[in-house]
Amino acid sequence: QAYEDSIRTPSLSFIEAMGTPLRSELSPHFVAVSKKIGGSLMRVYRDTRFAKDKTPYKTNVGIQFRHELGKDVHAPGFYLHIEPGNCFFGTGIWRPESAYLHKIREFIVDNPRSWSGILSQKNFSSDWRLIGATLIRPPRGFDPDHKLIVDLKRKDFIAHRNFSDSEIYRTDFVDFAINNYKQCSDYMSYLCMALEVEY
């Protein structure tokens, strides 16, 4: 009951409140689904099948506003992570299938100036950084000396921005979230173009 009252219910209320501004201020193609199971709120249970740590529950709240064509966490999305000492916003795509990953890499090769321009935008470069897994060697079929090889080696295309725990209690947290995601609008639009889905 404590989980229901202090975590799930307020999380679902936040998701519901995000629906209209998400569509009107960011993109009509990303969805906020306020459901206990199968919606934007990620499950509290950990997958312990291959983990040494068998603790059954996560210590964070994860919320993903994914693209309408996406079925799971591997779809492009706007993400919110709430955990004591580690609260952050995320934007992009996590562990895309190999075919989608190849599309993104090819798009960067074909449109390098746009990619570099987005990453150097002041409101993006000052507050956000790209995180995630990368290959040790250059991906097959791509020039190892390409000027953007660091980005071409990425396995995740996630932009990440931390914020303090106290921000969670802001009365305007919905606006705070939307304004942060807006800083990544061009970044998300670029990834959607690479994947040939609407933004």
Put a short name on every predicted segment:
Residues 1-44:
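Active-site acidic/histidine clusters and adjacent loop/turn architecture
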Residues 2, 29, 90, 103-104, ...:
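Short, hydrophobic/aromatic alpha-helical segments in well-folded domains
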Residues 1, 10-23, 108, 113, ...:
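Long, solvent-exposed, polar/charged low-complexity segments
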Residues 41, 60, 156:
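A residue-level signal for beta-strand positions that form part of recognition/binding surfaces
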